[in-house]
Amino acid sequence: DKPTTKPICEQAFGNSGPCFAYIKLYSYNQKTKKCEEFIYGGCKGNDNRFDTLAECEQKCIK
């Protein structure tokens, strides 16, 4: 059996990962029910990250 991964929009908000790049991306925040900017470190993290606010909202805001 494959482990079940949470849907992208239910994954942790703003997971920047262990690296030290400075990349502005957007992540869906379940607490505020909004897509918000965060800084991504460039590696690992999770799938709750989008290049644009519009892309995040299209995927996560119903």
From Swiss-Prot:
The record marks F20, A21 as: Reactive bond. Coiled coil: none annotated. Keywords: Disulfide bond, Protease inhibitor, Serine protease inhibitor. The keyword Disulfide bond applies. The keyword Glycoprotein does not apply. It holds the Pfam family Kunitz_BPTI. The record marks K44, G45 as: Pseudo reactive bond for trypsin. GO terms for molecular function: serine-type endopeptidase inhibitor activity. GO terms for cellular component: extracellular space. Gene3D superfamilies: Pancreatic trypsin inhibitor Kunitz domain (4.10.410.10). Disulfide bonds join C9-C60, C19-C43, C35-C56. InterPro entries: Kunitz_BPTI, Kunitz_BPTI_sf, Prtase_inh_Kunz-CS, TFPI/VKTCI-like. Inhibits chymotrypsin and thus avoids the accidental chymotrypsin-mediated activation of prophenoloxidase. This enzyme is required by the insect immune system to produce melanin which is used to engulf foreign objects. This is Chymotrypsin inhibitor SCI-II.
